[in-house]
Structure formats: structure tokens, C-alpha cells
């Protein structure tokens, strides 16, 4: 009976991780769009506009967004790994439970 509760718990955790993964992928996509926007802004702003500070700010923002994209990619990989581990554990528990059930019937 404990294995049933563990299977349910692991399945719920796996589903939660999938939702987190989907959310994280959305964040990666959104931040990539922001990086592209900032690259385009850098193309339009010229030094003769006497806005050197603006260029510096935009470059810093671009770097920050790129760092966020990298962080989200790493987080996605970690979440995916945990989901795979949970899937394996659920499979093992299910097989073990089947063997135990079949052993009792025999």
C-alpha cells in the first residue's frame, strides 16, 4: 500500500515538474526576444546622438537578459533530469508492486 502512495506522490511531482518546465521554457523564449530587441536597439542608437550612457545601459540590460536565458536553460535541464529520475522510480515501483501482487496470488 505504501508503494501506491509513493507512486501517486511521484506522479504528482512529475506533473508539477512538467508545469515548471513549460513555464521555464516560456521564460527562455521571452528573454530571447528581449535580447533580440536590445540588439536591434543597439543597431539604431549611434554615438553621435551623445547618449553614451544609454548605450552602456542597453549593453548591461542585454547582458542581464542573456544571463537569465542561460539560467533558465540550466534550470530546465535540472528539472528534466529530475522528471526522468521520477519516471524511472515510478516504473520500478510499479513493476515491484506487480511482482508482489503476483507473488501473493501464486
Curated annotation (Swiss-Prot):
It is found in: Cytoplasm. Belongs to the pole-localizer TmaR family. NCBIfam families: PRK05423.1. It comes from the Bacteria. Pole-localizer protein involved in the regulation of several cellular processes. Residues 7-34 form a coiled coil. The lineage of its organism: Bacteria, Pseudomonadati, Pseudomonadota, Gammaproteobacteria, Vibrionales. The keyword Coiled coil applies. InterPro entries: DUF496. Its main location: cytoplasm. Pfam families: DUF496 (PF04363). PANTHER family: UPF0265 PROTEIN YEEX. The gene is tmaR. This is Pole-localizer protein TmaR. GO terms for cellular component: cytosol. Keywords: Coiled coil, Cytoplasm.
Amino acid at each position: 500500500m505504501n508503494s501506491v502512495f509513493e507512486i501517486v506522490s511521484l506522479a504528482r511531482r512529475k506533473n508539477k515538474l512538467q508545469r515548471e518546465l513549460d513555464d521555464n521554457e516560456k521564460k527562455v523564449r521571452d528573454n530571447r526576444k528581449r535580447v533580440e530587441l536590445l540588439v536591434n536597439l543597439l543597431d539604431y542608437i549611434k554615438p553621435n546622438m551623445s547618449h553614451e550612457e544609454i548605450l552602456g545601459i542597453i549593453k548591461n540590460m542585454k547582458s542581464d537578459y542573456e544571463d537569465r536565458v542561460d539560467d533558465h536553460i540550466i534550470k530546465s535541464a535540472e528539472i528534466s533530469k529530475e522528471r526522468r529520475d521520477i519516471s524511472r522510480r515510478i516504473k520500478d515501483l510499479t513493476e515491484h508492486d506487480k511482482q508482489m501482487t503476483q507473488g501473493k496470488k501464486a
